[in-house]
Every structure is written in C-alpha cells, then in structure tokens.
Amino acid sequence: YVMMNASVDSLQAIRDVLPSMGTPTVLPLADEGQIAVHAAVDAGDIWQLLPSLRAAGATSILVLPVERLLP
C-alpha cells in the first residue's frame, strides 16, 4: 500500500505510472491545490515504482505493508 501527497496538477502523471489495483483514492489536503493519493500496489513492484512517482510529482511517499487484501 502506498500513500503520497501531490499537487492536483500532478494527479494524471501519477496515475499514469501507478499500477494500482483499481482506481486510487484521492483526498483533498488542507492546503488548496494539494491532494493525498492512496493505492494498493503489488509489493514486488513498489521499490522500482518510487523513482517514477517522485518524477511524476509525488512527495511524502509512505509505503505500508498489507496484512490481507480482500478483492
């Protein structure tokens, strides 16, 4: 599971590189024009994905383990 912050303008670029299991969750942040993006990502892909997410505009990236995933 990966969570990150970004500007609204970066959302499409992030979605283009994010191999999410379904659509990501996008939440507004306190600062105008800023969002949080949360997505379930295969654990085998996450570490190779991080540089691309940074290049797409993601900041404050958190990677969390998933105990169980119910499809």
Tell what function each PLM region has.
Residues Y1-P71:
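Small-molecule-sensing regulatory modules
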